[in-house]
Regions:
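Long, low-complexity intrinsically disordered regions
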Residues: 1-219
């Protein structure tokens, strides 16, 4: 089959259709099954702190589902349908993709400065992991490690840095309270279903190839 030329308008319609905008909205009660169909169409749901109307991650659901319980994403995470991880950004991801992200947890490729900090603060990181093990789930403010006034932007203290490092390595996983942007950190074994967490993980090259194919399918 030869190359197919599309106008800009046609290409936009193809992309919007692939993302589920051609599908009918549900007419009855919206539940986790409807959320799952949306995620299967989109591939993932990006998380963002922007909060003009609601948190940005809620808007794609409203655009495709209309009125729905605002706890849908949290419910899906609690039931093991989704997990949170850094993909291109922080995202809610279908749980079956967890093995495809294990290479990123092993290699920690995008956050070299955070990895270097963790290497230089091994005892602190280990202590934070012990705290999560004994008291989790916790939020970063539970650690009370800030020794200076909070500055601009994120300005993470040592406790938050340790939690984020452990989150990226897969030692801890995250949930969120309904309508609350703060991450709740807990041991991965208490968040990720055991059969998913222990499933064979493909090599980095194979995982990246499969993720690329899936990304193309959603567009």
């Amino acid at each position: 089959m030869g190359a197919v030329e599309l106008s800009n308008a046609q290409a936009r319609r193809v992309a919007l259709g692939a993302q589920g905008f051609n599908d009918r909205r549900p007419t009855g009660r919206v539940d986790r099954r409807h959320l799952r169909r949306v995620v299967d169409r989109m591939g993932l749901i990006q998380i963002d702190s922007v909060n003009v109307l609601v948190r940005s991650q809620e808007l794609p659901l409203f655009a495709r589902l209309g009125a729905h319980p605002r706890t849908l994403i949290d419910d899906a995470t609690r039931h093991g349908d989704l997990f949170e991880f850094w993909v291109h950004e922080a995202c809610h991801v279908p749980i079956e993709l967890y093995p495809l992200q294990r290479w990123a947890m092993r290699e920690h490729p995008r956050w070299t400065s955070l990895r270097s900090w963790a290497d230089a603060n091994e005892r602190l990181v280990a202590g934070v992991l012990d705290r999560v093990r004994s008291d989790g789930p916790i939020v970063a403010s539970d650690l009370e490690m800030r020794d200076r006034p909070k500055g601009t932007w994120w300005d993470w203290d040592d406790g938050k840095l340790a939690l984020e490092h452990l989150f990226r390595t897969g030692d801890v996983a995250a949930r969120r309270r309904p309508n609350d942007f703060a991450r709740l950190y807990d041991l991965a074994e208490r968040v990720i279903p055991a059969d998913v967490r222990t499933a064979p993980a493909p090599a980095a090259h194979d995982a990246k190839k499969e993720l690329l194919v899936r990304a193309a399918r959603h567009h």
